[in-house]
């Protein structure tokens, strides 16, 4: 069992939200999730540098790396050639969504034993509201529960599985705590130890602070997390964020929950690294239409429509080109998405493409979609899509699909990062 760290300090930052217990939120984060799952499934990979890609091709990008690979400088987003130059012995494995979804579901069930309020933030991260524990868990300490979850992960999923656990009064501080001692750490941030913990961190160690945000903070003499704690709310509102977000930062730093709202879907996208630079026009179009069908299925699974479609390509010289289409008439049938995508891609030099992508945007609910003049035809298309979706949910994705996207089995299912909205249809 990993060390449990609980730093104490006489310096305290008062929590404005006194009604919430200091240790009411638990953040659980699997370590290097995809790579660790692969090492669990294949014991011969344990202790070795492993990189996960959607496909093993020359131009493939790394979507996950084992801790052994990270220690050698391998990073998410690297291309295969760049990674192999750093680590010639790097082992590549393709994503297998069925494995990842299985672990996600097992982890969620374990977490649900400790609260009626469990939110999965992504396939490998979840939040437990410990104020809603069942009676048989009510008297247990959060640290005890966290230790048990870590042990159950090993026992019920696999002995190689590890997770980080963070405990605090809100999601932001709990996530910060979960990132303190990777891999396999467990930490608690309270009003008594927050200043001491923050004194050991850099600004970009805090969730939500990127290079751009750090630059804005530095411009008003905020250089450390301690400076950020000490900053006045007015400074964060007027000078840093220039919006209500500054007030949210002031509050989340003090343990007040401001991140418990569910955001609407603003866009849905997919991309694909082409396996060859010698694909025919028909082969390229089939891959485009495969992506379009997949996006349509995801859009309809949430009863949503789109009004915009954005297509792009990346060339072998790393030039990125795009086209977009925006209409007043919302759409979500495969036919509409395919038609718009076809038209836009004809305006781009597909012969030089290394990667292609499609994004649907201006997303709106089903109830907001307007009627068409040719509504009977639209109704038939809707019914056809509904039948396709039902068959594919029952028998597996792409059991039935358009003949125009035939022979594209090499386009694998992609696990969405940062959301679990679409996992049920994969």
Regions found by a protein language model. Give the residues of each.
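A short, surface-exposed helix-loop junction/capping segment
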Residues: 88, 268-273, 368-369
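C-terminal hydrophobic structural anchor segments
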Residues: 335-394
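Short loop/turn segments at connectors of secondary-structure elements within structured domains
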Residues: 159-161, 305, 352, 367
């Amino acid at each position: 069992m990993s060390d449990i760290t609980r730093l104490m300090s006489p310096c305290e930052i008062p929590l404005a939200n006194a009604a919430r217990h200091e240790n009411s939120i638990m953040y659980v984060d699997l370590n290097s999730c995809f790579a660790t799952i692969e090492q669990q499934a294949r014991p011969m990979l344990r202790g070795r540098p492993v990189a996960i890609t959607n496909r093993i091709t020359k131009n493939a990008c790394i979507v996950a790396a084992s801790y052994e690979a990270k220690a050698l400088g391998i990073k998410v987003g690297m291309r295969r050639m760049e990674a192999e130059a750093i680590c010639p012995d790097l082992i590549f494995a393709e994503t297998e969504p069925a494995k990842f979804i299985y672990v996600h579901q097992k982890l969620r069930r374990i977490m649900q034993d400790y609260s009626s309020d469990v939110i999965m933030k992504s396939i490998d991260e979840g939040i437990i509201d410990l104020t809603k524990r069942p009676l048989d868990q009510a008297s247990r300490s959060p640290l005890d529960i966290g230790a048990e979850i870590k042990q159950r992960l090993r026992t019920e999923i696999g002995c190689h599985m590890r997770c980080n656990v963070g405990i605090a009064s809100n999601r932001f501080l709990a996530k910060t705590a979960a990132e303190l001692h990777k891999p396999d750490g467990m930490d608690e941030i309270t009003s008594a130890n927050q200043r001491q913990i923050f004194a050991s961190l850099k600004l970009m160690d805090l969730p939500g602070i990127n290079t751009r945000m750090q630059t804005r903070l530095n411009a008003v003499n905020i250089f450390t997390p301690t400076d950020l704690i000490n900053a006045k709310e007015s400074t964060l509102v007027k000078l840093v964020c220039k919006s209500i977000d500054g007030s949210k930062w002031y509050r989340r730093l003090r343990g007040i929950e401001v991140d418990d709202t569910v955001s609407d879907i603003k866009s849905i996208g997919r991309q694909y690294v082409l396996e060859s630079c010698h694909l025919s026009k028909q082969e390229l179009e089939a891959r485009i239409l495969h992506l379009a069908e997949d996006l349509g299925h995801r859009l309809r699974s949430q009863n949503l429509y789109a009004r915009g479609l954005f297509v792009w390509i990346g060339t072998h010289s790393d030039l990125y080109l795009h086209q977009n289409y925006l209409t007043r008439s919302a759409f979500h049938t495969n036919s509409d998405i395919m038609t718009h995508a076809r038209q836009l891609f004809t305006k781009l030099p597909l012969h030089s493409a290394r990667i292609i992508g499609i994004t649907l945007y201006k997303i709106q609910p089903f109830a907001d979609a307007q009627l068409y003049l040719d509504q009977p035809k639209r109704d038939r298309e809707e019914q056809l899509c509904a039948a396709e979706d039902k068959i594919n949910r029952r028998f597996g994705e792409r059991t039935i699909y358009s003949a125009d996207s035939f022979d594209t089995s090499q386009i694998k299912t992609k696990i969405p990062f940062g959301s679990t909205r679409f996992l049920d249809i994969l």
